[in-house]
Amino acid sequence: MSSSLQELCRKNLPDDILPEFFDDYVLQLLGLHWQDHGSLQRTGKNQVLVQQEPIHINEALKVAASEGNFEIVELLLSWKADPRYAVVGALESKYYDLVYKYYNLIEDRHDMLPLIQNSETFERCHELNNCSLKCLFKHAVIYDKLPILQKYADYLDGWPYCNQMLFELACKKQKYNMVVWIEGVLGVGNFTILFTIAIIKRDLQLYSLGYSIILERMYSCGYDPTFLLNHYLRVVSTKGLLPFVLKTIEYGGSKEIAITLAKKYQHETILRYFETRKSQEC
């Protein structure tokens, strides 16, 4: 028996009796019995055994907090579990006494957000932090909480500045489903900023998504997209971005423009590609 366990036994068991084995009664006296779960044992820095089943200590903490079990939460925190999981677990089940007890252990409350799966809990976390709706919407984009934006769609419909900000953020963070939803449902004033962001970040998927969205709109309205395509073809050709050049040509951009600019700026990769294609066609 380790010295720390001996000390725990002397502190909690009657008559300083050190048991030879640990049944549920003894474990309960020691605070090592988790109601409805069984025995609780620390087996390493980041792991515990619950009724001999291994589980990450932070996951155990989240479960204990979601049950409102202060004793087990305190024990796991003393074993260096992450207090963020205690607050998140308590928030999920609305145990606000537990939430407020451990909330101040977290320096930046936004650090809890990656741990939250449920959109309602995500919103409660912002309410606790007295965040603005703009802050809530921004983090909803970053952490893929589309149901939050859907919930506030009518509110956002009258806030074009915020919609534009969220759209650009979704582009920068590569949240493609958010890009599609914000543009399609809320609308944005400056859609082509998507192409600028895609080129800066070398994000070919976003670049292609932009064309699939805007060309459908232009064709349905009877507009000719040639000017738009060749404008961005000039941009990506000047920069020597072959994958972007090919994608633009795929959507209808002029191959001649790409070759002309590749010659002007001596982009050998682009020139070799078209020379190889030409020789293969011959």
Curated annotation (Swiss-Prot):
Tell me yes or no: is ATP-binding among this UniProt entry's keywords.
no
Q: Does the keyword DNA repair apply?
A: no
A Pfam family (short name) is: DUF249
In which domain of life is the source organism classified? Answer: Viruses
| Induction summary | Expressed in the early phase of the viral replicative cycle.
What are the UniProt keywords, alphabetically? Early protein
What is the protein name stated in its UniProt record?
Protein MGF 505-3R
